[in-house]
A protein has these predicted regions:
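Protein-protein interaction and targeting regions used for scaffolding, dimerization, and localization
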Residues: 1-220
Length: 220
């Protein structure tokens, strides 16, 4: 049995991506780089807002400083700045491998579009076990639960950002810049989740873990 994470993508965002893919497959002479960079940044932001929604919830209910919201905004701003910039370098033919890679991560079910990535079955089981412990009132499980979710999220970063980035075969300078941006943004999110492990009670933590479990599906 395989397990995958399914994250919603807005229909209009997907429609833009599909149009760009069609243009590339038909050999359009019009550059698709700027349009693709824009739509990929929107897709990334939609995914980020879903997986880090606990930070926004925490900000609303617990934090008076807006610290979590600032973290989210820093991440989103970096994505919107660097993703279009990174794609803008390339001609249409160089974009095709990236678009084909990402198209394979997308699934449509009942007119709902998902971006998906696989996770190890053992990791999925550990998340489920952690959820059960939280539901039983185990306050000591909070930090471990959020650490496990960080692992699940980072698998997604690998499948949806690190691996497809290789399709573009950046030069050393650009690749190093992008790796730095990826490291910085993920570190911001992960450190904030880690800090929440010392601040949330088990009921709030359990709610978020259960929310994230809804993204995880077991497939034959």
């Amino acid at each position: 049995m395989n397990t995958a994470v399914f994250l919603n993508i807005h229909a209009n965002t997907y429609a833009r991506f599909a149009h760009i893919r069609t243009q590339l497959m038909q050999g359009s002479k019009d550059s698709q780089a700027n349009a693709l960079g824009s739509v990929l940044s929107e897709m990334a932001c939609e995914v980020i807002e879903q997986v880090f929604i606990v930070l926004l919830q925490e900000n609303q209910h617990y934090s008076q400083t807006g610290e979590s919201e600032k973290v989210i905004q820093q991440i989103l701003e970096a994505v919107r700045k660097y993703m279009p910039w990174s794609v803008s370098f390339f001609s249409n033919d160089r974009l095709v491998p990236l678009v084909e890679y990402l198209s394979k991560t997308l699934q449509i079910e009942d007119e709902t579009i998902y971006m998906t990535y696989p996770i190890d079955q053992k990791l999925a089981q550990r998340v489920e076990t952690s959820s059960q412990k939280l539901a039983a009132g185990d306050q000591q499980e909070i930090s471990n639960a959020l650490r496990l979710l960080t692992e699940v999220i980072d698998v997604g970063v690998t499948h949806l950002i690190r691996e497809p980035k290789k399709c573009l075969k950046f030069n050393f300078v650009v690749d190093k810049t992008l790796n730095g941006v990826i490291t910085m943004t993920t570190h911001l999110g992960y450190k904030r989740l880690e800090k929440l492990g010392t601040q949330l009670d088990h009921q709030v933590a359990s709610t978020y873990i259960d929310y994230f479990l809804k993204f995880m599906r077991h497939q034959a």
